Design a protein with these regions (language model features):
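Alpha-helical transmembrane segments and immediately membrane-proximal extracytoplasmic
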Residues: 1-423
C-alpha cells in the first residue's frame, strides 16, 4: 500500500505541476504576447484584453458541450461524492477534460483557483491505480485521498496541508491506516513538485508579529467579519449558479462566454479580479493597497468568482477565498492601524490572517487552512492570531450553515455526505 502511495505521489505530483504549466501557457496565449502572435498590436490591445475571459469561455463552452463529464465530474465535491458513494471510482478521461477546461478558464482570466481541479486530477490518478490493481473499496478510497494530498502538496508546495486536506475534507478519516499512505504520497508529491518547479514559497511576506496581547480582541472581531463575508460569498455563489441555470435563456454552450464577458468588463476598471489574483494578494501582503481599494475588491471578487463559476467556467474557490480574506484583512488592518498605530500590527499582518480565516470558513476546514497559510508564506510568527481568527470565522459561518461550500453543492443535488460517508 505504501509503495502504491509513493507511486501515486509521484504521478499526481507530476500531473498537478503539468496543470500549473497549462494555466501559465493559456495565460500567455490570452495576453498581449498571445495577441502579438496573431499580429495584433498597438491600439487594438486595450479593447481586446478585457475580452480574453469571454474567448476562454467560448472554448470552454465548446469542450463542455462535447464532453459534459468535464462539468459533471469537476470539483472537490465530486471527489467527495466518488469517495462516499462510488467506491472511489473517478473516470480517467476527467484528467484531460478537467485539466483543459479549468486551465482555459483560469488562464484566460476567469476568476477561479486551481485547487479544485488539482484535487480532481490527483484523485483521478489514485482512483485509476486502485482500480487497475482491483483493490478493495476501502483501499481505493485511501488511494484517492493519496492523490488529492499529493496534488495539493505539489501544486502549493505544502505537504502538511496536503495531508490535512485529504483527511479533513476528502475522507473525513484520521485513522492510522489512512494517515500513513497519505503522508507518503504527500511527501513524494512535494518532492516531485520541487524537482520540477523549485522549492519556492507562494507568497513572499515580511516578518509579522503580535504587537500586544490586547490585539487578540481585534483578531476576534476580524474572525467575526471573515465569517460573515464567507457566508456572503457562498450565498452569492449559489445565487449566481441558480441565476445562470434558471434565468439566463441562452444556449448552455454560450453561458461560460457570457460569464467571461461580465468578468472582462469588470476588469477594465479592476484588473485584480482576473485569474487567481495572487499578484494582488502579494500587494496586500506588502502593504501596497489603499484600504478603500481593498474593501471594494472584496465584493468585486465575490461577484467575479460567482459569475465565472456560476456561468459554467471551471476552477476552485480556494484562491478566491484567499483573495477575499486578504482584501478584508488589509482594509480592516489599515483602519485599526490608523486609529491605534502603536498598539496594532501593520495592515499586512491582518491581510495574512484574513486569508486563512475566509478560506477556513468557506471550506469548513480551519486546521487545513492554518497549516496551508504557514506553508504558503513560510511565516510561523503569528500563530496565535491565525489560530483564533480561523476558528472564530469558521464558527461564525456555522451559525448560518453547518456545511462547507462543497457539502452545500452536494446537498443541492440531494446528496448528504458527512465524514466521507453518506448520511
Amino acid at each position: 500500500m505504501l509503495i502504491l502511495a509513493a507511486l501515486i505521489g509521484f504521478l499526481a505530483g507530476f500531473a498537478s505541476t503539468a496543470f500549473r504549466w497549462m494555466i501559465e501557457f493559456f495565460g500567455i496565449v490570452f495576453s498581449t504576447k498571445g495577441l502579438s502572435w496573431l499580429g495584433i498590436t498597438g491600439t487594438a490591445l486595450p479593447f481586446l484584453l478585457p475580452l480574453m475571459p469571454m474567448f476562454g469561455g467560448i472554448v470552454t463552452g465548446i469542450i463542455c458541450h462535447f464532453f459534459p463529464d468535464a462539468v459533471k465530474e469537476n470539483g472537490v465535491h465530486r471527489v467527495m461524492h466518488a469517495v462516499a458513494l462510488k467506491a472511489g471510482k473517478i473516470r480517467k478521461r476527467t484528467l484531460i477534460t478537467c485539466s483543459a477546461t479549468s486551465a482555459l478558464t483560469i488562464g484566460s482570466g476567469g476568476s477561479a483557483g486551481r485547487e479544485g481541479p488539482t484535487v480532481q486530477i490527483g484523485s483521478a490518478v489514485g482512483s485509476a491505480l486502485g482500480n487497475l490493481f482491483h483493490l478493495s473499496r476501502e483501499r481505493v478510497r485511501v488511494l484517492v485521498g493519496c492523490g488529492a494530498a499529493a496534488g495539493i502538496a505539489a501544486s502549493f508546495n505544502a505537504p502538511l496541508a496536503g495531508v490535512l486536506f485529504a483527511l479533513e475534507i476528502i475522507l473525513g478519516d484520521f485513522t492510522i491506516h489512512t494517515f500513513s499512505p497519505i503522508i507518503v504520497a504527500s511527501v513524494i508529491g512535494t518532492a516531485t513538485g520541487r524537482a520540477l518547479e523549485g522549492n519556492e514559497i507562494t507568497f513572499h511576506v515580511p516578518v509579522h508579529e503580535l504587537v500586544s496581547y490586547s490585539e487578540i480582541i481585534l483578531y476576534l472581531f476580524l474572525g467575526l467579519l471573515c465569517g460573515l463575508v464567507s457566508r456572503l460569498f457562498t450565498l452569492v455563489y449559489f445565487k449566481s449558479n441558480d441565476f445562470f441555470e434558471e434565468k439566463v435563456r441562452i444556449p448552455k454552450i454560450l453561458k461560460p462566454a457570457l460569464g467571461g464577458l461580465i468578468v472582462g468588463l469588470i476588469s477594465i476598471g479592476f484588473p485584480a479580479v482576473l485569474g487567481n489574483g495572487y499578484d494582488f494578494m502579494e500587494k496586500a501582503l506588502s502593504g501596497e493597497l489603499l484600504w478603500s481599494m481593498a474593501f471594494l475588491l472584496i465584493f468585486l471578487k465575490i461577484i467575479s468568482t460567482s459569475v465565472t463559476l456560476g456561468s459554467g467556467g471551471l476552477g476552485g474557490v480556494f484562491a478566491p477565498s484567499l483573495f477575499i480574506g486578504a482584501m478584508l484583512g488589509s482594509a480592516f488592518g489599515a483602519l485599526v492601524h490608523d486609529i491605534s498605530p502603536n498598539l496594532t500590527a501593520s495592515p499586512e499582518t491582518y491581510a495574512l490572517v484574513g486569508m486563512g480565516a475566509v478560506a477556513g470558513a468557506v471550506m469548513q476546514a480551519p486546521l487545513t487552512n492554518i497549516l496551508m497559510l504557514f506553508e504558503l508564506t513560510n511565516d510561523y510568527t503569528i500563530i496565535l492570531p491565525i489560530m483564533i481568527t480561523c476558528i472564530v470565522s469558521a464558527y461564525t459561518f456555522r451559525g448560518f450553515s453547518k456545511n462547507s461550500i462543497y457539502i452545500q453543492k452536494l446537498l443541492k443535488e440531494g446528496i448528504n455526505i458527512q465524514h466521507g460517508r453518506e448520511v
